[in-house]
Amino acid sequence: MDKLRFGRHRKIMPFEPGSVEALREASREKAAALNQHVLGYGAIVEAEWAGAGIAAPDLPAMRKYRLERIRAELKRRDYAGALLYDPVNIRYATDSTNMQPWVAHNPTRHCFVATEGPVVLFDYFSCEHLSDHAGVVDEVRPAVSWMYLYSGELTDRKVRRWAAGIADLVASHGGGNRRIAVDHI
């Protein structure tokens, strides 16, 4: 029998992805090369600005300013940090996006901004490359999705795991303060 056929059909060679680390690195390199995760103003607007002598916004400075504003308000209100679920708030804090309409209605992606500590983004597995461009996310962890659609009868266990992860962040970076701001869950 022909080795390129299986029965009457041609043989489809299986995809061999290699290691998870290699796939993640390839995703990061591709995202950086294509600059596909930075939403911009577009070529027409950039040309108009150049024609009018208007400089493009300094995105790294803007990201730093936004994070400083968040932390100043958290400090003023004596919070250890903020837990963000709203995709607009996550975008403001981290300048990263991932399936905005979906996560607007399903608690699957979130972010913790410590008042005096790291910005930890909880995202879908292997989506680290979606926030690499921003330079303000200190760590990306896999999100623990505790909604029934994802966890079914394991929801109680997932909620406890999620809560323990948030409590650990607050204990590690809250300086003894256990109060956090939450936009919504």
Language-model regions: role of each:
Residues 1-185:
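A composition/biophysics-driven feature that prefers long, compositionally simple stretches
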